[in-house]
């Protein structure tokens, strides 16, 4: 078995940032994976969706991707019991955040999210996203449901199936 500091990224060819490097330094990425601007050579793309324009109360979910990147630096490259290293099983990288062309226009933001995830899907890459408020779910699904049905597991304290609020059907209470 390789030592944890010998693991090279199949995406960049560089060593993963490991326990040998301080967790408080450098640019935070999800689980300290490489930050890339291409989908080539990827199996899994880690994506931030820093948006909470669909909330009716308590904004702040837009900070979720940044904080998840920071906190995920404490996750080790392999599971301490099973000794499984997911980075040996798949080519994984952080592809950054969805960029919003007009952050205050919810419908355009939805289109930006949908287009971003469609590009990932069309490249044959599996996206794993961190958001944002619940309203980001629908455009993500629209971006990846193009050629066959997908499954979804919804875990929440309530169903979030509200109707229109304040003249909009796009909000955190109706993510699907």
Describe every region a protein language model picked out.
Residues 2-176:
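Conserved alpha-helical scaffold segments that buttress catalytic/binding sites
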């Amino acid at each position: 078995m390789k030592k944890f500091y010998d693991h090279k990224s199949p995406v960049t060819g560089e060593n993963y940032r490991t326990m040998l490097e301080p967790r408080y330094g450098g640019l935070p990425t999800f689980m300290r994976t490489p930050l890339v601007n291409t989908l080539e050579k990827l199996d899994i793309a880690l994506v931030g969706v820093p948006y909470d324009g669909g909330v009716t109360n308590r904004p702040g979910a837009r900070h979720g991707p940044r904080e998840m990147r920071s906190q995920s630096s404490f996750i080790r490259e392999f599971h301490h019991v099973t000794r499984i290293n997911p980075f040996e099983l798949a080519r994984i990288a952080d592809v950054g955040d969805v960029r919003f062309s007009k952050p205050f226009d919810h419908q355009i933001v939805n289109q930006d999210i949908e287009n971003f995830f469609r590009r990932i899907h069309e490249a044959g890459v599996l996206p794993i996203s961190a958001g944002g408020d619940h309203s980001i779910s629908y455009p993500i699904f629209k971006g990846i449901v193009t050629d066959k049905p997908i499954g979804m597991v919804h875990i929440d304290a309530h169903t979030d199936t509200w109707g229109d609020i304040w003249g909009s059907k796009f909000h955190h209470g109706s993510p699907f």
